[in-house]
């Protein structure tokens, strides 16, 4: 009996993976990731300017601004973060000297990135309906203004947890290391769940969004470690590109990040569709 159950479970899993592969290819996920990478490269500096501008409006987060910068640059690029931070800080400083019209233009460019993300995810859900442009603009504006506040609150909570873990590590060895490993995964999981549930124009059940978010969060953390190892032990890119080596590395990392985001989205919608296609169990 158990052998039959395991065989059924194996066939069910194999069928789902096959369906996921077909969905991944039919949605041209790798091409979509490339498009989002291109838009992200254009929108990166405007988005950072908008975020830091909003942060400066809340003095309570002044102490956390440096932590936010470190977290952003660590996730933007697992290695070469210091060099990237130097470049982007220079860009942000130059952009902050712009007039009100220039800052407004930066907001528009940042909103273009969010619009591209919206369209990409809804294309995966194959939802042709669209929000009114005023509603979309209001949502994007709210995310741009409230997003930094939520990030600041999350960093404050993370800093508090880290201080507690450092204290507890004196009594139980390994707690701080566990928190350092666990908190980024939980943060990524929450981010992906919110994205997969709120961005699509149709209702997505939490269990499906959570499934895709777990896989995406684990892949994201694993890719950071593997990418760091590759950059550290196989630095051939530096010999080829020299001082410009950070640029292609950043492009590749942003592409991998978007690919993971889209993989999680395809997993979420594939699981939902595959479950609906399965015949209902016969009642005795």
Curated annotation (Swiss-Prot):
<dbReference type="InterPro" id="IPR017039">
    <property type="entry name" value="Virul_fac_BrkB"/>
</dbReference>
<dbReference type="InterPro" id="IPR023679">
    <property type="entry name" value="UPF0761_bac"/>
</dbReference>
<keyword id="KW-1003">Cell membrane</keyword>
<feature type="transmembrane region" description="Helical">
    <location>
        <begin position="214"/>
        <end position="234"/>
    </location>
</feature>
<feature type="transmembrane region" description="Helical">
    <location>
        <begin position="41"/>
        <end position="61"/>
    </location>
</feature>
<feature type="transmembrane region" description="Helical">
    <location>
        <begin position="137"/>
        <end position="157"/>
    </location>
</feature>
<comment type="similarity">
    <text>Belongs to the UPF0761 family.</text>
</comment>
<keyword id="KW-1133">Transmembrane helix</keyword>
<protein>
    <recommendedName>
        <fullName>UPF0761 membrane protein IL2447</fullName>
    </recommendedName>
</protein>
<feature type="transmembrane region" description="Helical">
    <location>
        <begin position="98"/>
        <end position="118"/>
    </location>
</feature>
<dbReference type="GO" id="GO:0005886">
    <property type="term" value="C:plasma membrane"/>
</dbReference>
<keyword id="KW-0997">Cell inner membrane</keyword>
<keyword id="KW-0472">Membrane</keyword>
<feature type="transmembrane region" description="Helical">
    <location>
        <begin position="178"/>
        <end position="198"/>
    </location>
</feature>
<dbReference type="Pfam" id="PF03631">
    <property type="entry name" value="Virul_fac_BrkB"/>
</dbReference>
<feature type="transmembrane region" description="Helical">
    <location>
        <begin position="247"/>
        <end position="267"/>
    </location>
</feature>
<keyword id="KW-0812">Transmembrane</keyword>
């Amino acid at each position: 009996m158990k052998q039959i159950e395991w065989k059924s479970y194996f066939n069910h899993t194999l069928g789902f993976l096959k369906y996921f592969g077909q969905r991944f290819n039919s949605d041209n996920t790798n091409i979509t990731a490339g498009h989002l990478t291109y838009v992200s490269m254009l929108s990166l500096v405007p988005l950072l300017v908008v975020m830091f501008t909003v942060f400066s409006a809340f003095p309570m987060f002044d102490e956390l601004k440096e932590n936010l910068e470190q977290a952003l640059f660590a996730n933007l690029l697992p290695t070469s973060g210091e060099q990237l931070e130097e470049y982007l800080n220079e860009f942000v400083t130059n952009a902050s000297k712009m007039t009100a019209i220039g800052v407004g233009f930066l907001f528009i460019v940042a909103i273009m990135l969010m619009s591209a993300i919206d369209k990409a995810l809804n294309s995966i859900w194959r939802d042709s309906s669209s929000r009114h442009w005023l509603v979309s603009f209001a949502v994007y504006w709210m995310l741009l203004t409230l997003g930094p506040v939520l990030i600041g609150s999350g960093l404050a909570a993370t800093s508090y947890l880290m201080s507690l873990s450092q204290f507890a590590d004196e009594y139980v060895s390994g707690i701080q290391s566990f928190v350092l490993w666990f908190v980024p995964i939980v943060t990524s999981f929450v981010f992906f769940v919110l994205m997969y549930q709120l961005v699509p124009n149709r209702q997505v059940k939490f269990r499906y969004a959570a499934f895709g978010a777990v896989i995406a969060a684990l892949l994201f953390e694993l890719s950071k470690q593997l990418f760091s190892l590759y950059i550290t032990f196989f630095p051939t890119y530096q010999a080829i590109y020299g001082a410009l080596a950070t640029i292609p590395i950043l492009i590749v990392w942003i592409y991998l990040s978007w690919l993971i985001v889209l993989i999680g989205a395809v997993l979420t919608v594939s699981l939902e569709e595959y479950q609906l296609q399965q015949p209902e169990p016969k009642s005795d």
